[in-house]
């Protein structure tokens, strides 16, 4: 099978119908093929026994099916969870690699998936940003992560499946919006065995304003989380230099206000507390002022240590002071627990030496 063949899982139903038409096949075959791909997770065309031998031959000559290959699997147990947090390293068709995480708590089984190989935004506190940007993931590579994590769930809890998906892995989802939306539409359609409500899917972004506006007009029901980390423009530029200069705070606040008004849904503001940098009372006051301009809730996150990166987490007393000021200001604030820190699976940690392509 030629590696130059297009992976058929990257085609939308309409695109597959058009491709089959060129092969002289009726449109309804596309639905049958998608059922085999997304309900039965067929790893080869030979498994699609409902199709004729002649059609299977045509498909194998024109397309490939390339399931993501698991090359590494790590897990660690959290104090308050019976099930471990699990991280998998997946190899793609071009031998690139990407990490995905399964977070299992009492009532939820959450997939944390990647949208890019590396990240172009170069935030200095994030391991993924230090590995540079290689390429966007295709829709098929995104859904492939979900199916790989869902298999982990089913192996340990027969009959169970993922309950939530968060696009908080490697990369900036809203710099790959088209493929992310296509993957979400596949994962949330009732046409396939795996069907998850869009309300259980969260897209995290640094604040890519044009794409936030696009989401607001799309009619999608996904949740939106915005990584803010500072409510002062100059300070945010030091922490998120590329994102903050391209999408300034003032314009971002306006876009989020318009988003919440058009969708009726709150935005989650994610704020990573860094010792001596963005953890002062003045920082809390600026965050409160910014967040009161639109419907939102705030997630405070403790910094997860990363090798060769010198930021430090705040003391618990500082974090509590910061949180209490926001609460006293009338805001809804939670401290988000980090999972998988010991296996570098927590927020900002996805990128290790094993991410390098094998020599």
Curated annotation (Swiss-Prot):
Boundaries of every Radical SAM core domain copy? 105-342
Per its UniProt entry, what is the enzyme's top EC class, as one word? transferase
Under catalytic activity, the entry for this protein gives: adenosine(2503) in 23S rRNA + 2 reduced [2Fe-2S]-[ferredoxin] + 2 S-adenosyl-L-methionine = 2-methyladenosine(2503) in 23S rRNA + 5'-deoxyadenosine + L-methionine + 2 oxidized [2Fe-2S]-[ferredoxin] + S-adenosyl-L-homocysteine; adenosine(37) in tRNA + 2 reduced [2Fe-2S]-[ferredoxin] + 2 S-adenosyl-L-methionine = 2-methyladenosine(37) in tRNA + 5'-deoxyadenosine + L-methionine + 2 oxidized [2Fe-2S]-[ferredoxin] + S-adenosyl-L-homocysteine
Required co-factor(s) are: [4Fe-4S] cluster
Question: Per the record, what is one GO cellular component?
Answer: cytoplasm
Q: Which Pfam families match?
A: Radical_SAM (PF04055), RlmN_N (PF21016)
Gene Ontology biological process terms, A to Z: rRNA base methylation; tRNA methylation
Among CDD domains, the record links this protein to: Radical_SAM
Main localization of the protein described in the UniProt heading: cytoplasm
Q: Does the keyword Iron-sulfur apply?
A: yes
Q: What SUPFAM superfamilies does the record point to?
A: Radical SAM enzymes
Subcellular locations according to the entry: Cytoplasm
Task: List all disulphide bridges recorded for this chain.
Answer: 112-347
Q: Where are the transmembrane segments?
A: none
**Binding locations of S-adenosyl-L-methionine:** 171-172, 204, 227-229, 304
Q: Please name the GO terms that the record assigns under molecular function.
A: 4 iron, 4 sulfur cluster binding; metal ion binding; rRNA (adenine(2503)-C2-)-methyltransferase activity; rRNA binding; tRNA (adenine(37)-C2)-methyltransferase activity; tRNA binding
How is the cofactor bound, in the record's words?
A: Binds 1 [4Fe-4S] cluster. The cluster is coordinated with 3 cysteines and an exchangeable S-adenosyl-L-methionine.
Sites binding [4Fe-4S] cluster sit at: 119, 123, 126
State the protein's purpose.
Specifically methylates position 2 of adenine 2503 in 23S rRNA and position 2 of adenine 37 in tRNAs.
As for family, the record states: Belongs to the radical SAM superfamily. RlmN family.
The entry's other comment says:
Reaction proceeds by a ping-pong mechanism involving intermediate methylation of a conserved cysteine residue.
Matching HAMAP family: RNA_methyltr_RlmN
Q: What is this protein called?
A: Probable dual-specificity RNA methyltransferase RlmN
Gene expressing this chain? rlmN
